[in-house]
A protein has these predicted regions:
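Exported/extracytosolic protein signature
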Residues: 1-235
Length: 235
């Protein structure tokens, strides 16, 4: 919103006197909201953002600029951006009707220009961003990013912010190796499993992580160790 003021001056008989100052508030007719379709993120995900612009006035708003900060935050002496705009993903809908692809500068920041909002109507902008290596992976982390709408005769800029939390969960991968690769009858084989957790929370006993390995032909005299410690054999 914008505040304006006014003061009158009265001149008479060679003298001057000023009135009191009156203040008014210019109400903005444009509102903006921003939401993410996905409820959480992990590194490498694509997030879909929906920006809705609603014009409650009686005059169309034209040639607006929408700027997304792509979640930039201070790091060292500069700024890093955890989101990367996905090329050609931006779409615009006016009253639910698809429009021509908007002019986009990928940034950062992401800048979308030439946006129009009809009188008494709404415009929806949809675009995607890739969660990159600068997205904080630690548990309870978030990506907070803001869009700012300017131009089109607006008295002041309009902003809308969305916060997406990290997915607090383990992420396991397993790799299997065999040594030696070539064997003869009755020769011992060593199978090695490497399990890695790239998530942000540990795997605990209640997660019931189980390795199942089916041998064909069936092997005998099995010995299982975990980090050098023998495990109970169950065959």
């Amino acid at each position: 919103m914008a505040i304006f003021s006014n003061q009158a001056t009265l001149t008479y008989n060679g003298g001057t006197t000023n009135s009191n100052i009156v203040y008014g508030e210019l109400l903005e007719v444009l509102t903006a909201t921003k939401t993410a379709v996905e409820g959480s993120y992990t590194p490498g995900d694509r997030l879909t953002y929906v920006v809705t612009l609603r014009n409650t006035g009686t005059t169309a708003l034209t040639n607006l600029t929408v700027t997304d900060d792509l979640g930039g935050y201070p790091f060292g002496t500069g700024t890093v951006y955890p989101l990367t705009y996905v090329t050609d993903s931006a779409q615009v809908f006016v009253g639910g009707v698809p429009q021509a692809a908007p002019a986009v500068t990928a940034g950062p920041p992401l800048v979308i220009t030439g946006i129009n909002v009809p009188a008494g109507g709404d415009t929806v902008i949809v675009y995607q961003a890739l969660v990159n290596i600068f997205a904080p992976p630690a548990a309870e982390s978030t990506i907070v990013n803001t869009v700012t709408i300017t131009g089109g005769g607006l008295a002041s800029s309009i902003t809308a912010t969305e916060t997406v939390p990290v997915d607090n969960a383990p992420a396991l991968t397993i790799t299997k190796a065999m040594s030696p690769a070539q064997v003869v009858d009755n020769q011992q084989i060593t199978y090695t499993f490497l399990i890695q957790n790239t998530g942000n929370t540990p795997v605990v006993a209640t997660d019931n992580a189980v390795i199942t390995d089916t041998f064909d032909p069936i092997l005998s005299n099995l010995v299982v160790t975990f980090d050098g410690t023998a495990w109970t054999q169950g065959v």
